[in-house]
Amino acid sequence: MDLLSLITGKKFEKHYSKVGSRFSDESLNGLEKQLSNGADAAIDTTADDRGSVVSLGASLPLSQGRPAKSKNILNDTLLAEDQYLVTWDGPDDPLNPRNWSHSYKWWIVIQVSVITIVVTFASSVYSSGIIDIASELHSSIPVSTLGSCTFLVGFGVGSLPFAPLSDIYGRFIIYFVTLLIFTIFQVGGGCAHNVWTLAIVRFFQGVFGSTPLANAGGTISDLFTPVQRTYVLPGFCTFPYLGPIIGPIIGDFITQSYLEWRWTFWINMIWAAAVIVFVFIFFPETHEDTILDYKAKYLRKTTGNTAYYTIHERERDPKNAMIQAATQAVSLIFTEPIVVCFTLYLTVVYIINYINFEGYPIVFAKYGFNKGEQGLSFIGVGVGIVCAGLCTPFIYWHYLKVNKKRNGVICPEDRLYPLFIGCFLLPISMFWFAWTCYPHHIHWIVPIIASAFFGFSLLIVFFVSYNYIIDSYQHMAPSALAAATLVRYSASGGISMVARPMYLNLGDHWATSVLGFISVAMVPIPFIFYRFGKSIRAWSKNAYKL
């Protein structure tokens, strides 16, 4: 048995014993007897070209229910009659992630959130040591900034392969293996003796750290219905942004202390290693096709009958899946107005966010903040992000109200309401910050309050854009989100190289104002798609038509 099967198979058996009925020898022996004797009292039979086909619903709790997915309708019809096809045991199958308890689902979301904080923390903590890195490794500050750039580009590149790989091999194994490799590359960062090694190591940290960003949406969709996702996704989305905010807060105190910049890598390595152990012990498989594969393996192992199978096992083709995912993502980003516009919006807020990691220390150093206090200046953004997350119940209540009013028929455009506020708060917060950061005339708390409104709008833009893309493209949403992730992180990585020169050359006021003017250009997007979104989706070859 290979390592993957050993890990996932054992976890499946352990998890099955918790959430569903155990297999009993009596039921399995009874099933084999019924199959051999053709006991019509317990099972239904349907004739096909091989003789009799048996539905196992009355005999085995792992065999019947909602059919597995297939792209071939005729193939679905034939396979649905196959006695050895393993599917759900009805709509209430306890192994179906949608049927797990609400508390257990949230426990899984918390685990994914912790993984996300670990990797996004790494994206920004590096910026705290750039000046020290330049000094110790005899490099310029712009060249030392390259490590931030390559990490973000790696984030974007990694989003393309890991989403389809998790659909092939399951969520757990992808989370576990990539987080393990991410942790190993922290050692390379801590031991680096030149900036080019740091840049390469940081790139691979980004690639293998991108998994929660690429797969979290899929994990949440495994567990929750679209209506439930209205409150789950905003709650989760606080963590991809809190990680980068925590980075400079902790990083500035580390580099200011006797520990020096290398400990930004060692701290990340220790934290990530602890999370790996946590994930290995507690994280279950949530991908439904993979769970069905484990069911089939369990049946083959327990009964000794190798005929049991799933559609996913027969149709699995990693090479074609990877090619299809990449070509689909590229196609969507160039041909779909919804993907193009909301990717642009996400890219703008990400660029602003990562420019702030370079700009805030410059701004607040003029207030007399020491290095540790400069990191604390990001608390305002964090407070705004948390406040946006706390608005989730009100957004969910509104969505339920619309859902009830329309008898369960709701449009993707109904997701856009929160952005009607967020789209204005973003430029307001930028101009507020730009023209109140006067150290000798205005107290530092005023721009900090402005940064809180930026954090609020940041989260609103993120979860509204994600929900709208998911609802608009449904089965193609992973490719659309992967394309958005690639573009926004690659662009953020490139722009981060010019953030410090921009603030030094333009000054605090105009550098921030430039970002404010760019965000003003994004204001019409939610209103345009609220008015014309349905027509745009009707025109599209790929979008969901209501």
Swiss-Prot record:
It comes from the Eukaryota. InterPro entries: MFS (IPR011701), MFS_dom (IPR020846), MFS_trans_sf (IPR036259). It is found in: Endoplasmic reticulum membrane. The keyword Mitochondrion does not apply. One of its GO terms (cellular component) is plasma membrane. GO terms for biological process: transmembrane transport. Keywords: Endoplasmic reticulum, Membrane, Transmembrane, Transmembrane helix, Transport. Pfam families: MFS_1. GO terms for molecular function: transmembrane transporter activity. Belongs to the major facilitator superfamily. CAR1 family. This is Uncharacterized transporter mfs2. The gene is mfs2.
